[in-house]
Amino acid sequence: MRRSDREITDPGEILSIINDCKVIHLAMVDDGEPYLLPLNFGYACESGAFSFFCHSAREGRKLDILRKNPTVAFEMDCRGALDEHDVACHCGYYFASVTGVGHVEFLDGEEKLVALTSLMRHMASREDQFTEQQAHAVEVFAIRADKLSAKAKVPHSAQ
């Protein structure tokens, strides 16, 4: 990371950033062509390994691509605000972000139910429980982060 002064390595702060983000941007490759989508997500962190859970219709281009090539990149960001100055060239933007690469695994059974509950917990602060019938109506996949980094530019008063 070029700007090491902005790198976030504290696991608690990384979790805080992830919790503040509501959209993960998922990048994949379809026969040499990049394809990028914004998705809502839930997440889990077990022994320092992050998984991000997404749901989808049971068919479509995204799923076709992921089944052929499960390698992905992802990005999420939050806490955005303009760092305004009188001179335009001195303006900037405050942010917090998490980026990484990983692979997709399609979920079923209990793992799928847990992922859907995680998604609702993150997006709506609810502890919904899902039935097998409800879960059957959607496809659910986990983005398993193989590499992950976090970065932030915060106002001086917040440092």
Regions found by a protein language model. Name each.
Residues 1-20:
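Extreme N-terminal tail/first-helix region
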Residues 2-3, 79-159:
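Charged, gly/pro-rich active-site loop segments
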Residues 17-18, 65-66, 119:
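A generic structural signal for nonpolar/aromatic side chains embedded in well-ordered alpha-helices
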Residues 19-21, 69, 135-138:
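Short gly/pro-enriched beta-turn/loop segments at secondary-structure junctions
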Residues 23, 36-38, 71, 95, ...:
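Broad gene-expression machinery/nucleic-acid interaction feature
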Residues 56, 61-85, 89-91:
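Helix-adjacent hinge/juxtasegments
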